[in-house]
Amino acid sequence: MTAPVGAASSLSAYSGENRRGRLVEGRRASSDRPFTAISSLDRVFDVLNLFSLAKPLWTVDEATAALKHSRSTVYRYIRTLVKAGLLASVGRSYGLGPRIVELDQQMRLTDPLLRVAQPQLAQLRRRLNAVVLLMRLFHNRIICIHEEWDERTGVPAAGRGRAVAFFRGATSKVILAHLPTRRLKSLYLNHARDIAKAGLGDSWNAFAGNLRDVRRRGYHISEVGELMTGVFSIAVPIFSGDRKIIGSLTVLQCTSGKSSRSDELPLAAVRKAAGDLSKAYAAIESGLTSDMKLASQKLARQLAQPL
């Protein structure tokens, strides 16, 4: 049985290669901590990770049963999260707390990638009459951090904060194609069935070969209907200053008579926008945009003033 993608935050620590470069399961890098050495901080975040759209409220007893810790330990962790504002009591249950709303607002206003991307995404939406998404890689999750949407596009809204399938769709495939080989091998060991089901290959060599083709091409176009009926997507990678993959610029369009041939799609505009975003983010990382720092400080002063 394959492990669920959303719970695979430590996959890369348990695979490696032998001297002949063959895939070996169960090997940990020497720099990794022992499997049993789980810190209290990790366990606190294990509690926070229980909360989802499927189950937004948890009692102490439910969390204790799910995490298999003592009730007193789980209660102590919940109390810590409540004190930090990350959880809040709802009757005898607990849900996400107001501090998360505050942090989300802070990210919307100050996230460097989001700030440089918003004008370009809005321009692309108007030019292409399409939904434009800014996707961010987070461990083994890919999350929408901004969406430019218009109901006239005919594409359902995705929504900020929504995660996408890790092995399906243009976004996931273009991001996977730029992950380090070691991480891809770990993913394959743990998700071979899901990878085959997504059409990415029924062997490690096939999986690696398919992703190599995407990487060489520099973009990926999904099949119509792969994730949404009548919709196809174009995704181009976004990189940090050291050329590590951090996410993608993704465009969703309804078919409505459009061809899925790459020479008839707005690839040039999407690739240019993604390239510009990578350059802008690299400039921010290298400290070349001091004006953004000044703007953030000004914004902080404004937000600190009472209403």
Model features per residue range: what roles?
Residues 232-236:
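Short hydrophobic beta-strand micro-motif common in sensory/regulatory domains
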Residues 2-14, 18, 154-229:
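Short, solvent-exposed recognition segments
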Residues 206, 217, 229-231, 245-307:
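Juxtadomain coupling helices with adjacent low-complexity linkers
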Residues 2-110, 114, 275, 279, ...:
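N-terminal helix-turn-helix
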Residues 238-241:
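Sensor-regulatory modules in signal-transduction proteins
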Residues 50, 66, 116-127, 133, ...:
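Amphipathic alpha-helical regulatory segments at dimerization interfaces
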Residues 98-190:
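Amphipathic alpha-helical effector-binding/dimerization core
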